[in-house]
Amino acid sequence: DGDIPMEPSFDGEKIVIFLSKSDFADYKILKLHEGVRGPLTTTLVLPVLVEALHILKEESDGMDDNRRWVRALARRIERLGLATESQPLLLAQKLLELPVKRALSSARMLAEVSS
């Protein structure tokens, strides 16, 4: 299984993130720890969501797409009044409620506990 990068798949009804076996084993352990959950989400979900938003942008508004994730993401953007956002990275951060800020806060708390 070795060292392979994570790879998202956007072809199905849901977005799937594939990890190597060792990365997935680490993920299963780490996701249970509150202090690590924020940075973990930022590391895995944010880049994949940015890529999904690029796909959504290229394929217009997504409402005619038959993939459930495309329709759900387009509806959520519209519902939050973010449909006109032009930068996928900024939009992804808004959709995930500032994950970098939360990840930094979690990491700071872990560092303070460790000190």
Show the residue positions of the predicted features.
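Bergerat-fold GHKL/Histidine-kinase-like ATPase
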Residues: 1-115
